[in-house]
Regions:
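The conserved beta1-alpha1 loop
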Residues: 32-36, 101, 233
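Helix-rich cap/lid subdomain of alpha/beta-hydrolase
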Residues: 132-196
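Conserved HGGG/HGGXW glycine-rich cap/lid loop of the alpha/beta-hydrolase fold
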Residues: 20-70
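Conserved hydrolase catalytic core segment
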Residues: 94-137
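Catalytic active-site module of serine/aspartate enzymes centered on a nucleophile-bearing elbow/loop
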Residues: 254-291
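Alpha/beta-hydrolase fold catalytic core
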Residues: 1-33, 52-56, 93-94, 129, ...
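Active-site loop/oxyanion-hole signature of alpha/beta-hydrolase fold enzymes
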Residues: 22, 46, 58-99, 277
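Conserved serine/cysteine hydrolase catalytic core
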Residues: 179, 189-250
């Protein structure tokens, strides 16, 4: 498909909050795409475009739909999982194919097991599954390895050129696909009061999400996952030192594990074509086996 494919930007009431999302029309089953901490659904755009019109694609935005302070423990991922289950229920979508990245992968897993999100298949890209002993620890923001950095994140640029120079200078963005980098510049930043640009997902909101990551242990849920699962791990991911995704795959009854060559933790941003092809193959196989 070409870049002419564009989603509708919609909002869904889930009872005590509203979640904005991108909706791509399609003729087939629903694919739910859930992003990583601090990012946004627009970064799925090349992948969503590749899935339509064979699939209907829904990509929600989880940043600030709930108020949470990082100093008070942040936003519990168990709460996010419940929100995702209600979001799908309110939209009337069930037995969905789900792809989550990082936070999105973990939240998706919790939503499936704890809140009954009906899924036909899960693709978990670099899920955040910390060592079990870290869950339940009450960390201060300055002691959390990710929240402490997020809350200090650079959050001001004079214009798009200034912002792009900054992004291109940072190791985090160095291997991103060019289209996705421009999508981040366009949708991941917004005008600030001083007429410059700032991050759409405020650093305090991002830090609150990171703080919430240690409040619920997802490991005991893995043996209860009932659908086929594919875990994708970046070959060069910096998560490898503390996240054992082979162990996670072994704990899930119908899971397989696959390495994405040349990718770091941000697999969808660095290898969108590989991810899109993998999703089409995995979801297509599930459809063929059920027909």
């Amino acid at each position: 498909m070409t870049s002419a494919v564009q989603p509708r930007v919609l909002r869904q009431d889930i009872g005590d909050a509203e979640i904005s999302y991108l909706s791509y029309d399609g003729d087939g089953p629903v694919v739910l795409l859930l992003h990583a901490t601090g990012f946004l659904p627009w970064l799925w755009h090349p992948i969503a475009r590749a899935l339509t019109p064979d699939y209907r694609v829904v990509a929600p935005y989880l940043c600030d739909h709930r108020q949470a302070e990082p100093e008070d423990g942040g936003l519990d991922w168990l709460t996010l999982a419940g929100d995702m289950a209600r979001f799908c229920d309110r939209l009337g979508i069930g037995n969905v194919f789900v792809t989550g990245h990082s936070m999105g992968a973990t939240v998706t897993t919790i939503a499936h097991v704890r809140f009954g999100l009906r899924t036909a298949g899960l693709v978990l890209i670099e899920p955040v599954l910390l060592p079990p002993e870290l869950y339940g620890i009450r960390l201060r923001v300055e002691d959390h390895p990710f929240a402490s950095r997020a809350i200090k994140r650079t959050n001001g640029w004079s214009d798009e050129e200034d912002a792009m120079r900054y992004l291109q200078s940072r190791e985090l963005f160095r291997n991103w696909d060019a289209e996705i980098l421009h999508l981040y510049l366009r949708h991941g930043m917004k005008p600030s009061q001083d007429r410059g640009l700032r991050l759409a997902c405020d650093p305090r909101s991002e830090a609150a999400l990171f703080m919430g990551s240690v409040r619920f242990d997802p490991w005991p849920l893995l043996p209860q996952v009932r659908c086929p699962v594919l875990i994708l791990e970046g070959e060069k991911s910096d998560q490898k030192s503390y996240v054992d995704l082979k162990k996670a795959a072994a704990a899930i009854p119908r899971a397989s594990h696959q390495i994405v060559a040349g990718a770091g933790h941000l697999v969808p941003m660095e290898k969108p074509r590989v991810v899109a092809e993998t999703l089409r193959e995995f979801f297509g196989a599930r459809l063929r086996s059920s027909s």
